Amino acid sequence: TNRQQKAYIGIQKLQQSYMTDNINEELSAALTKLTETESQVKTAKENMSLANENLDLATFSYNEGKASMVDVLSAQLSWTQAHTNLINAYLAEKMAVAEYKKVTSE
């Protein structure tokens, strides 16, 4: 009947709207994650640069007799932590890119 057809069409439109909302939500989340991870990589690179500088300075100061081995070891630990954070940031960024490509079907 005509009434059933209208009801069926209404249900179809609601389902389509629901699917569109879900897709938009997934896309928005993927874009947000991508932006966040790009920022994390930038920050991690800056921290890595500072850790390199700090380690160079601590090593130089130690060789000049101005710093202790503890200072060098502390700088090495900071460098290792910065390096680990950079690797994790790159990994998170790659995962965010993969999720974005999945959502956009690239």
Name the predicted role of every residue range.
Residues 4-85, 92-103:
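Amphipathic alpha-helical coiled-coil segments
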